[in-house]
């Protein structure tokens, strides 16, 4: 009986170790539901040998904190300027494993069809985090709604705030709002500057519904796969990066999102 019990215990331990080993081989990737998780789920079908678990982010979750704490192995939801801001805020250094796609920032309205119809003192909802706030102001400038101070010429290297608006001919009122909440504010504001992923989640088509849209040319806000430096050369991360930048994934992005999400140049 003692031998049988010992043998059963040994089997249980072996199964436990095997399960732990299998878990260790699984990559946990934190991602926004749209389009990031959808793209990752396509990768799972494209490359069944790559074992990944997609952890969809809920409102308020910080995927960089999850990564820093080891709760996930990588994340896929952000662009480089936001990542740099997060590295400063968290006192951490991360590694970019792949550059995948661009989600052009857009200006939306349920009240107006053309910027010329926007009245004076109209309200404009913009993201409240530093990088996307600056990005929104540069977009408003590109549409002729405001003008920033002369030193703000490069959105990739300078962060503008509402205090840096030099000209505001319509006296627009800039309202800083949590990015995921902005689509819900569309009925309450005159204009809303919305990130591509949140626009898609809200059922908007950036390519069709936006009054003004960022150009994809030389856009510094490409979305990236990010990991910890100690995993940067992990074969699983490298395999995922290769899949995400493959021609097959680029074609999936083009067909699925019809210009609302734009793949970067894929690897051959």
List the model feature ranges, each with a label:
Residues 98-109, 134-141, 200-242, 244-268:
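Periplasmic-binding protein-like
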Residues 85-97, 110-112, 186-188, 193, ...:
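Ligand-binding "clamshell"
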Residues 26, 30-53, 62:
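Short, polar/charged alpha-helical segment
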Residues 97-147, 250:
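A conserved helix-loop-strand patch within extracytoplasmic ligand-binding domains
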Residues 34, 58-60, 75-84, 101, ...:
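Beta->alpha turn/N-cap motifs
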Residues 55-65, 152-184:
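Short helix-initiation/N-cap motifs at beta->coil->alpha
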